[in-house]
Amino acid sequence: MGVNWTKEQRQVIESRDRNLLVSAAAGSGKTAVLVERIIRMITDGERPGDIERLLVMTFTKAAASEMRERIHDAIEKKLKEDPGNEHLQQQAIMVQYAQITTIDSFCLHILREHFDCLDIDPAFRVGDEGEMLLLRGDVMEELLEDWYGRHDPAFENFVETYASGKADGGIDDYIYQVYSFSQSNPWPKEWIDECRRELSDTSVEALDRTGWMQFLLEDVRRQASEWAGQLQEAARLCSEEDGPGAYLPMILSDLSNAEKLREVSGYDSFVQAASGFEFPKLAAVRGKHSPVNPDKKEKVSECRKRIKKAVEKMKGQFLFASEEEILADLAGSSEAVLMLLTLAEDFAGRFEAKKRERNLVDFNDLEHLALQVLYREEKEGGEHRPSEAADLLAGQFDEILVDEYQDSNLVQEALIRAVSRERFGTPNVFMVGDVKQSIYKFRLARPELFLEKYHSYTKEDSLYQKIELHQNFRSRRQVLESTNDVFYRIMTENLGSISYTEETALHPGAS
């Protein structure tokens, strides 16, 4: 007896020839659906596909092993129904050699196949965690000893400013954190150079372009949008026959100020909009001829008090200085940050050299060396474009399937893009995950990659489609309702990058 798939699960299983993002909540049958999709791809139709023409990437080796086993078991089940099927017999054999793998293992495969494109010994090995930790410590010690010996004023000022306790307290951690973050970018040196350029540009326009200023302004616009919605509701209550009509002029004035904050595009426009957001005392309400509903009066009054408190908090947090004062402060601190970038870059070069001496690579190396194989840098403009090797790999895979996509980072995104067929006009990447379960930001995962697609892909049939699986087949209704009650209250776009709504909540899929 076949599985009774839901409508959404069938869509995931049967959709083809597109980039497909699947937002799969906990207990929604994600793995079963993924396996069924693969089985259908290699068994359905007059010309069924081959398992070796699929690239299936999982987050852990254990997940890859489980996926391979489940696919093999599903093929064997099909073979029992049709034992003479030569294609299925071949798939049962080839599943052991198929690219069902972690991204690190796939990168290692690329390096083994294309080591001639790189300046590395083909006999390299991947160092274990303990070995790399010791080597990293040796390199850091050597680096700091060297810099102390130079008596460089910028370095000495940096140490004096940021060292804690005796000796180098904390300096090595700062250096390694910047190095580690740079490695989460596809081209680390370019990221460091871009940071230097940003620090060197001290114009007002440059201030507005900085990442932290954009974050601040986006937060302001988001809050102002929420206030505008609440004030529109308050204005509606004021306009009703038994509403507090005397409050309406002030509420409309507040709404106008909130709308101005929604439109801020730079720090100067924010200062002007926020400074002008004042809250004069509400007019007295007298209902001689048309008594005012006390509940409506209270709702409007409380709404305004709540927004006033939030606006005052925002002013206290963000209206701390003029643009000129901020730029002066940044100029004063930029020397230390530039020194930190130099130290991180120096550490990267030394660490790389030590690893090459020992013919070692670490997991960062696997990904970045794979990018060297898959991309070539244009001489003019420095743009990175997929290489011939990338084009060959793109031709080998009919589809790329990525599990736990919410835990991908920018490096992995660049790798996936290089071996996909999107640049040829035939997108073929299947991504499944749940941004609500993203727990690896401390490892520099970028759940915003998932969110960008979630917000830009359409639910309609298209080349860039998203499908949501929110039915839970694992837990009882009472458990789901309790879970939803908690997350409706605590998961907001500001806190978890996505709002927990009726659409994204867990719904019972089994009685």
Ranges and model annotations:
Residues 29-30:
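Conserved glycine(s) of the Walker
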Residues 43, 72-80, 108-119, 137-149, ...:
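Non-catalytic alpha-helical coupling and interface elements of nucleotide-dependent molecular machines
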Residues 172-361, 464:
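Conserved ATP-driven helicase/translocase motor core recognized via long
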Residues 51-157, 211, 448-452, 481:
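Conserved P-loop NTPase-based nucleic-acid remodeling module centered on helicase motor cores
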